[in-house]
Amino acid sequence: MYLIFDTETTGLPRNYNAPLSDSENWPRAVQIAWQLHDAQGMLVEHKDFLITPDDFTIPYDAERIHGISTELATEQGVSIHHVFEEFEKALSKTQYIVGQNIGFDINIMGAEFYRYGVTTRLGELPVLDTCTEITAELC
């Protein structure tokens, strides 16, 4: 199976090479959506979660990009722990992680797992990044 996922965040990291343990560097996840596809490309599962802000706010500059305000995420979001549980279920079913510039999203979620001391297999799976030299101008 192939897991395609994307996140929306509170912004961008100051240093893309910083370790995931540098919590001040990595922005917070405010939304995650994913699809699981089988080997024939058929959609098996789709999930989309707004994440309730836990001791952080969503800056206006980020809200202007993705449209998710602190108020919206607070009202309609779910606990990050629920997201971890559901995402780990999806990770347990997949052989590959796929996405456009997916390293960013992997780091965002990896930093979230680290912040909360949750073990994940996210960093153990092979990655297929659709952001190639040919598509780089679109990234």
Predicted regions located by residue number:
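Metal-dependent phosphoesterase core characteristic of DEDDh/y 3'-5' exonuclease domains
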Residues: 2, 15, 26-70, 88-139
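Short acidic, Gly/Ser-rich segments with clustered Asp/Glu that frequently serve as metal-coordination loops
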Residues: 7-15, 20
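Acidic-residue sensor for enzyme active/binding pockets
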Residues: 8, 23, 112
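Short consensus segments that form the blades of beta-propeller domains
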Residues: 20-26
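Alpha-helix initiation/capping motif
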Residues: 23, 73-76
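Glycine-rich, highly charged phosphate/nucleotide-binding loops
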Residues: 75-85
